[in-house]
């Protein structure tokens, strides 16, 4: 019997809520001054438009207030999200928890991320495409941003039904094969996730996929996982070209590991320069809480002629987005100390 989307998602989020935080109780030599310095830098970079990613700093500075699940239950009472065309060839498919993006090309459709499981792939991805007047049989590639079940879980369903190529980094394919389990959950893989897909197409840093004139360039951005992918591609808004980056992994749900948090921060510094060279002016996430996709889609519904597309945030906002991620990672590192066991 199929589990309802609401019930399944509630259990899934509960698990993530337990795993995504990094408790300061692990601290050995926490540095409150450094925490404050990095949180201040992240807050300055966030301004008023990047409050979603700024929430990552809460792992370093927990404060009283509604719990994650309180906020999630309030969110659940809202109507489900409908699929939506957000650029000339870019479509939102997803829930209020996890997102898939569809890129339409002259040669078929590319899906970026496959959500939690087969039910969601069928309901949100396949069903969402049909609602938008697109044919899911035209899916040619499914890009899996990283080896966590909330992004690969529906991939095998799509593979079996439509036979697209499944794309992930070599590093994260190896992680799945070595453990035969979701790296996030170790020996306790969440049964709400679909089975890990079978290895198909591996990409490395700097590789490109071409489909009928549309090019996707992949960068390996170690941090969230060691093989997380950022996918960079050109989209158009009413014919005007823009450069988008789908940043494949955001939270620090790998545990209290100072070296890993430093790696995460180093990655954001490196890719600020790379995305500056790419002239990226759109950032996309696979969770709506990080790219504010819900508010942006609402703005598009009321968009008047001549108004800008809310998803086109500009190169400065892309740079600030990465600054927030990196500074919150360093704040979290300072909050847990350098002598944390298991680093």
Region spans (language model):
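Active-site HxH/HxHxD metal-binding segment of metal-dependent hydrolases
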Residues: 31-34, 38, 44, 119-123, ...
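Bacterial N-terminal signal peptides
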Residues: 11-21
């Amino acid at each position: 019997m199929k589990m309802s989307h609401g019930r399944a998602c509630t259990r899934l989020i509960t698990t993530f809520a337990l795993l995504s935080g990094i408790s300061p109780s692990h601290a050995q030599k926490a540095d409150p001054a450094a925490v404050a310095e990095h949180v201040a830098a992240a807050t300055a970079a966030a301004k008023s438009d990047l409050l979603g990613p700024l929430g990552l700093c809460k792992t370093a500075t927990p404060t009283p207030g509604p719990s994650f699940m309180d906020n999630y239950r309030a969110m659940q009472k809202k109507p489900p999200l409908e699929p939506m065309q957000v650029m000339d060839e870019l479509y939102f498919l997803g829930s209020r928890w996890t997102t898939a993006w569809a890129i339409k090309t002259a040669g078929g459709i590319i899906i970026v991320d496959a959500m939690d499981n087969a039910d969601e792939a069928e309901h949100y991805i396949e069903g969402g495409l049909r609602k938008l007047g697109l044919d899911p049989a035209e899916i040619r590639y499914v890009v899996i941003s990283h080896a966590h079940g909330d992004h690969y879980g529906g991939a095998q369903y799509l593979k079996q039904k439509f036979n697209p190529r499944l794309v992930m980094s070599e590093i994260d394919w190896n992680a799945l094969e070595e453990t035969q389990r979701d790296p996030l959950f170790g020996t306790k893989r969440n049964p709400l996730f679909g089975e890990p897909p079978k290895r198909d197409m591996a990409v490395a840093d700097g590789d490109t996929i071409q489909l009928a004139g549309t090019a996707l360039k992949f960068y390996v951005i170690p941090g969230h996982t060691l093989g997380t992918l950022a996918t960079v591609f050109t989209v158009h808004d009413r014919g005007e070209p823009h450069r988008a980056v789908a940043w494949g992994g955001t939270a620090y749900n790998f545990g209290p590991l100072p070296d890993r948090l430093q790696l995460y921060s180093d990655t954001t510094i490196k890719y600020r320069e790379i995305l500056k060279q790419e002239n990226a002016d759109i950032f996309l996430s696979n969770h709506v809480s990080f790219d504010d996709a819900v508010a942006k889609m609402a703005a598009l519904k009321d968009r008047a002629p001549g108004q800008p597309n809310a998803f086109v945030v500009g190169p400065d906002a892309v740079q600030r987005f990465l600054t927030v991620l990196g500074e919150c990672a360093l704040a979290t590192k300072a909050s847990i100390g350098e002598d944390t066991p298991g680093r």
